[in-house]
Amino acid sequence: MAEAGKQQDFPSTIDIPLAGMHLSRGTTATLDQRYVNVLFELYTNPLTGGKSLMAVKRPGLAQFSQPPAGAATGRGLYAWAGSGKIYSVFNNKIYSNTTDLGVTLAASTGRVWFAETSPTSTERILIISDGTDNYHITTADVITQIDEVDDPQYPQNNLGPVLFYDDYIVQAQSDGEIWNTEPDNFTSWTSLNVISSAMYGDELEAIVRLKDQIMAMGKQSIEFFFNNGTSNSPFLRIDQNSLQLGLATKNSLSFAGESIMWVASTPAVGGGSRQVWLIEGSRQGKRVSTPALERILNAETITSCTAWMETIAGHLIYVLNLATSGRTWVYDVSIGMWTEWKTASDAIFPGMAATSVDGQVYVQDATNGRIYTLNPTTYQDNGSNFTVTIQTDNYDFGTPMAKFQSGLWLLGDNTTGTINVSESDDDYVTFNTARTIDMTVTHKFLAEGGMFFQRAYRFEYTQNAALRLQKFSLKLEVGVG
């Protein structure tokens, strides 16, 4: 016999995935659906073709080295196969592993940029640019500072990004001039070896290589150049490829392999709106930011951001640190989804640059002078537990009637300790006192749950252990009035 006051045609058990999209209604960090300190993994059944999306705890940080032996501002990191060493810049010093190479950079602040010549070049060197001077490092760690004293036609006050392209070193200036050295002569600059990006009236912000082309990225436009083999400047613009889409700041620009990502300024849609864009190889570029993220980007002092790209545990990720809002956003190129990363103290993720050697990712801290390893089998950040937080949308389950929850089941791998589960029935204003689910057992269950009209769920896990979750299930009944 039916229980009085309850609907009988409502599904008794409802499954809710624990992976999805951030749904922030504004710039507040704590409201709405959010996924913190996870990556998503997509699994496909080869027999049925069925797919399941799981939330997996992000990799953790462990200290690898501290080249300056104390707190210092991180400015760039690069692993060079030519010497088998990791090069870093902290404050105004260059380090080879932990050895200070004994020069003081001309520009004492801002991101530095790296390029390496080919093993078949006359001179195999690593080039570091701070936007004022270049620093050429040999495989024996002999360093030479290059500026207008060495060559009066050296492009002073350049943008910083330095490229190696077909035996040329290429740099650019904000007025749109793109300079190249003489072929296979990396200290010889002449005023004839210049071409300008001049289709639009905006200033140049950065250059980056995409396969066999150079992208000249202005603040509101992008032009493409290729090696046409002409004398002086060998580059020729591909007019039909130009885009009325700019680069909001070069600090957001990052690349790995044939993938390039950046925060774009988009005058074509009015108001200079900011979006995150991705170009992969020869494919057409695409916008990958969500409306929720774009609201945050448009409220940000974007020039203070940092960004990097690396592959970790099978995920090619773009990590965007927004200093003004104190938040770190991570885009997984493999599956096209965003998550958010935080530290144990609920602060911005500390890594401002990254590099990798033989599958091991290294991350440079923004302020403390340290270099960390980033590893999927490390479940802390430098010895401190950080919290995985999954907060769901505010569900009414398709009806305004009262709902009665009689059980909650969590589907995920067995692991260490407990996970906290709490609910909000007042649009995220308050959450009730968390109950715990034992993650060491197969049957992960909470009894009862009371009555609600709309409810959001929050799962928090702070153990020094792995975590992989797929979904949770609710047993609900609905009132009739």
Predicted regions and their residues:
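Asp-box/WD-like beta-propeller blade repeats and closely related beta-sheet repeat scaffolds
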Residues: 139-165
